[in-house]
Design a protein with these regions (language model features):
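Sec-dependent signal peptide recognition
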Residues: 1-10, 14
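Acidic, metal/ion-coordinating pockets
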Residues: 19-353
Length: 353
């Protein structure tokens, strides 16, 4: 029996500079630009200013990726239980343009809000993204992978989640098969995962399985290493709504959670929940990590990610501390300005580059 690998191919708009030498990828966390459900909570200028401070960084990358937390649809009722604080997100389809304008090339749909408005919401979201030329993946049986072309180089992306309608990272055997098939098609592979417990107390990456609200949310260290061992070159996560540490494992880059990036409504932005980094990662033509940088932005209610005076490196400091605590044997170092480098080991010495 042959298994069908569902793949969406997008020919992206901006060029890849010196691909034979390197590729720079901009990674971000959760995106929920506003919602019309149950009552409208939309940003000033109908979304025009959401990405004003981050647009240049995202556009300058060869590839910009993030997690679309919710749906892009203009009507419909949620299947979720009616509660006063109902986390069901319905962003107008017109806001897909702001994703494109911000510089995004790919978004994950493998999260616990993609089905907030049922299959109709999924179809509407897919259509809105296609209209803007933005690739997507993460829904089992519909959009399991995407391939983005850059000057003849095929970059494969897959998005994993823990919900029944996603490509589940709880089934490592299935993940391995997906990566094997993607590796046969592509030169570089990027994996996005949605997992981990949620909340301000969940900044550290534990060993073993994480749970939240009775759900199994993944053994994320094991998952990330498994993906690298089976062909992935870059792995990035989201789901806890706070940032977590990074590591370089076998020469490949892993970010365990990039937190809330552009979530001006409906999600707490207090304290560390408002930390909104962009992490840029430069890899060589074989996918090996070369260098990176953590750009520190802070969110405030209704505004999106912003630079803040006196806090230029605040998020980088947090991610540096978490990385050094949780991944002391990583091959990466982070300085106080957010630069990420690679530790080189020799027989007689240890050097950083």
């Amino acid at each position: 029996m042959f298994r069908l690998l569902l793949t969406l191919t997008i020919w992206a708009g901006h060029s890849l500079t010196c691909l034979s030498a390197s590729l720079t990828i901009a990674l971000t966390g959760d995106i929920m630009m506003g919602t019309t459900y149950p009552t409208p909570r939309l940003p000033r200028g109908d979304g025009k200013y959401l990405f004003r401070d981050t647009r240049d960084i995202l556009r300058q990358a060869d590839l910009a990726v993030g997690n679309l937390e919710g749906t892009l649809c203009d009507k419909g009722e949620t299947r979720k239980e009616g509660k006063a604080n109902n986390y069901a997100f319905r962003t107008p389809t017109s806001y897909a343009w702001w994703l494109k304008d911000a510089g995004y090339d790919f978004v994950s749909m493998a999260n616990n809000h993609s089905f907030d408005f049922g299959i109709e919401g999924v179809i509407s979201t897919e259509h809105a993204l296609r209209q803007q030329g933005i690739a997507f993946a993460g829904i089992a049986g519909r959009s399991e992978t995407a391939v983005v072309m850059r000057q003849g180089v095929r970059i494969g992306l897959c998005a994993l989640g823990h919900n029944s309608y996603t490509v589940s990272h709880l089934d490592l055997k299935k993940v391995g098969k997906l990566l094997k098939q993607l590796r046969q098609q592509c030169d570089i592979i990027i994996v996005s995962f949605h997992g981990g417990a949620e909340g301000t107390a969940q900044s550290h990456v534990p060993n073993g399985m994480e749970g939240f609200l009775g759900e199994r949310r993944g053994a994320l260290r094991q998952l990330a290493h498994y993906c690298i061992d089976h062909g992935a070159d870059v792995v990035y996560g989201h789901g806890p709504h706070v940032v977590r540490g990074i590591e370089v494992y076998k020469g490949r880059f892993i970010a365990y959670s990039l937190g809330n990036f552009c979530t001006p409504f409906g999600i707490s932005l207090q304290g560390v929940s408002g930390y909104a980094p962009i992490v840029t990662v430069t890899i060589d033509h074989k996918g090996r990590f070369q260098k990176g940088r953590i750009y520190s932005f802070i969110q405030s209610y209704g505004a999106g990610p912003r630079k803040q005076d006196g806090k230029r490196f605040l998020v980088a400091h947090q991610m540096k501390a978490l990385s050094e605590t949780d991944f002391p044997h990583s091959d990466a170092w982070i300085d106080l300005r957010g630069n990420i480098g690679l530790i080189r080991y020799t027989r007689r010495s240890l050097t950083t580059i």
